[in-house]
Amino acid sequence: MTLFNFIKLFKKAHEENVKQADLEKKKAMKQIDLRRANDTEIMLTKVNIPLADMMAAVLGMDEYVLDVDQIENLIRFCPTKEEMELLKNYTGDKATLGKCEQYFLEVMKVPGVESKLRAFSFKIQFGTQIAELNKGLNAVNSACEEVRTSEKLKEIMANILCMGNILNQGTAEGSAVGFKLKSLLILSDTCAPNSKMTLMHYLCKVLASKASDLLDFHKDLESLESASKIQLKSLAEEIQAITKGLEKLNKQLTASESDGPVSQVFRKVLKDFISMAETQVATVSSLYSSGKNADALAHYFGEDPNHYPFEKVTTTLLSFIRLFKKAHEENVKQADLDKNKDAKEAEMEKTK
């Protein structure tokens, strides 16, 4: 047989086989909706990890290989029941399938993969969430302690009470043993007749002349500003959400026992994580119980915590500090102006 006859005899058959293979490949690519497949493949290029290595990282909950954004993307692109059924029923050569289908097939090897991915996401974010909770609760507890133990603040409050009793002398309010917190903010609104001087200016002036060491009382309350930005209700909700998340992880651990060898590493990592996480959540919950004593801060000022919660106490005190500092600065500025004016007048007297 000549080479020409050989080519003529077999080339057409070979070309038909190639066409059939291309047809099968194109047909395979259409197993998943084209747009869905394209979006999935775009996601995979961003992850850029071999599929087998990626799933090993998922089962090992290895946050050094996958970050939380990548995990959330994998969750978004988990195959649906319909897609899994479609691929299970596919009888062609799976090696010819597209990247999306290959990814779905790899994911399908892991039982309950979406739940495992969510557990992985929870694990990655847990450390940051606990750190933020600890930071917030410590700020609340520190602020409460600082306010209750500040001797300078107590003395300033005593001076304000004394001023109020003098102003109300001869009335039923002239022998008060305390005052409402909101009264702290009224000091800046109460002016002397025919004068720009307010009660706050007067308070600062008296303290500057007789007890100047009290003027920096705000330094005793360093945690107040950070604590004022914290909502105790939000902290409680976050702790509750984390606690519920751990409950789901315990259920996930139990469910994975029936997975067999494929989830062996996952079970060990998850079990160790749950043990550590439950200890940290217990510590945070205990700290929150102490933080709930923030209600005692309202009682400390004679207020009802139901009407004057921690957040309102801290914002009122911060406003008082701001108004106090402003009044003192204005007093100092006015004193300098008066001093310069007196100096000029004295100089003019000399030149007469």
Swiss-Prot record:
Disulfide bonds: none
Pfam families (alphabetical): FH2
Database matches in InterPro entries: FH2_Formin (IPR015425), FH2_Formin_sf (IPR042201), Formin_homology_domain (IPR051144)
Highest taxon of source: Eukaryota
Gene3D superfamilies: Formin, FH2 domain
Recorded family membership: Belongs to the formin-like family. Class-II subfamily.
Protein name: Putative formin-like protein 15b
Gene: FH15B
